[in-house]
Amino acid sequence: MNNQSLQRAAMISEHLAPTSELNMNQTSAPIKTAKEELADFVEIFPILTNEILKELPGMDMPPQTIAWVEKMINVNVSGGKMNRGLTVLHSLQLLVEGRQLSRSEIFLANVLGWCVEWLQAFFLVADDIMDQSITRRGQPCWYRQANPISNNGTIGSIAINDSFILESCIYILIKKYFRNEPYYADILDIFHETSYQTELGQLLDLTTQPNRGDFSLFTLNTYRRIVKYKTAYYSFYLPVALAMLMAGITSTPAFSTAKDILLPMGEFFQVQDDFLDCYGSPAVIGKIGRDIEENKCSWMICQAILNGTPEQINLLKKHYGLDNPTDVELVKKIYGEIGLKKIFKDYEDESYAFLISKIKSVRIMPQEVFIKLLSKIYKRDL
């Protein structure tokens, strides 16, 4: 083991349960339950947060600024389902096929998992401002929360800058834990690429409804393009691709195969999300759905246009995109008349069968990587 590897092992060992006589790169971790893996994942969050915060005094940041950053990270990064973050570890476990991961590998996979969660937080803080969303994860969106310094207003547009800080944290953590890894540049590339793809997806999402009542852009082709870039890359491809890099996979066909399955899986996930935005309970999904009020190009409106009568579509043009309860309820009533719940159920079953068929044809990497991810989202909270 070279000096750089020894230094990295020593740094990681500081954050793990005491095993001072053990070589961190050779010691296998005991097999754990899903609940224990989640607990381990959550346990390192304050460690990573501290890595960010401890740099700030040396940058001459005053106490109130440090406190702001700490609260902003705690509110926005933690508290979700953490499925994206845990997918890195779960995928790596399956990719090494038959070998038990070392404690060091588990820790590093969880660091990358938290970087994915930080990326998600960066997107959501900005997205909530652009969409004028009300709640996130069962509490007011960050920009709507009380300003912790002035105490006489909300955080408001300061949250825009906070989203930038959240993005910067990702690269601080990657540099600290992965700078000496052979795949360091690849990790940086994929995070930069995924950020750009998601930002383009957000632009597509925000510019497909320029005039209320104009449904010309509300097509499934437009919808699929939005979803591919806004959701599928960062939610599905990124965590698995990070695990592949950690596993030493460099084959271009392997990454192409992963993308070929994970991007359609991301569309499947977003269609579920659109359905839940309309019919899901805020207590279950953690937010108040606003796709109708915001005139969004959602799967629901695209299917309504495809399956509705001319009279129903004309009514939708009059009432879709208006921010008041009466219009929203009328839109939902029309959705019910068109039978969107049945259309969604059929779509879900057909998409699941399609994805299973694609997964069964995979030979270049373990099929279970994709099966495990699909099992997490099929029939979720519906």
From Swiss-Prot:
Isopentenyl diphosphate binds at residues 81, 84, 120, 137. CDD domains: Trans_IPPS_HT (cd00685). Transmembrane segments: none annotated. It catalyses: isopentenyl diphosphate + dimethylallyl diphosphate = (2E)-geranyl diphosphate + diphosphate; isopentenyl diphosphate + (2E)-geranyl diphosphate = (2E,6E)-farnesyl diphosphate + diphosphate. It holds the Pfam family polyprenyl_synt. Its main location: cytoplasm. Its EC number is 2.5.1.10, 2.5.1.1. Mg(2+) 2 binds at residues 127, 131. InterPro entries: FPS1-like, Isoprenoid_synthase_dom_sf, Polyprenyl_synt, Polyprenyl_synt_CS. Mg(2+) 1 binds at residues 127, 131. PROSITE patterns: POLYPRENYL_SYNTHASE_1, POLYPRENYL_SYNTHASE_2. Keywords: Cholesterol biosynthesis, Cholesterol metabolism, Cytoplasm, Isoprene biosynthesis, Lipid biosynthesis, Lipid metabolism, Magnesium, Metal-binding, Steroid biosynthesis, Steroid metabolism, Sterol biosynthesis, Sterol metabolism, Transferase. One of its GO terms (cellular component) is peroxisome. The keyword Lyase does not apply. Dimethylallyl diphosphate binds at residues 136, 230-231, 270, 287, 296. Inhibited by aminobisphosphonate drugs (aBP), such as risedronate and alendronate. Gene3D superfamilies: Farnesyl Diphosphate Synthase. Its cofactor is Mg(2+). GO terms for biological process: cholesterol biosynthetic process; farnesyl diphosphate biosynthetic process; geranyl diphosphate biosynthetic process; response to xenobiotic stimulus. Pathway: Isoprenoid biosynthesis; farnesyl diphosphate biosynthesis; farnesyl diphosphate from geranyl diphosphate and isopentenyl diphosphate: step 1/1; Isoprenoid biosynthesis; geranyl diphosphate biosynthesis; geranyl diphosphate from dimethylallyl diphosphate and isopentenyl diphosphate: step 1/1. GO terms for molecular function: (2E,6E)-farnesyl diphosphate synthase activity; dimethylallyltranstransferase activity; metal ion binding. The keyword Cell division does not apply. Binds 2 Mg(2+) ions per subunit. Key enzyme in isoprenoid biosynthesis which catalyzes the formation of farnesyl diphosphate (FPP), a sterol precursor. Involved in the inhibition of cell growth. Belongs to the FPP/GGPP synthase family. This is Farnesyl diphosphate synthase. The lineage of its organism: Eukaryota, Amoebozoa, Evosea, Eumycetozoa, Dictyostelia. The gene is fps.
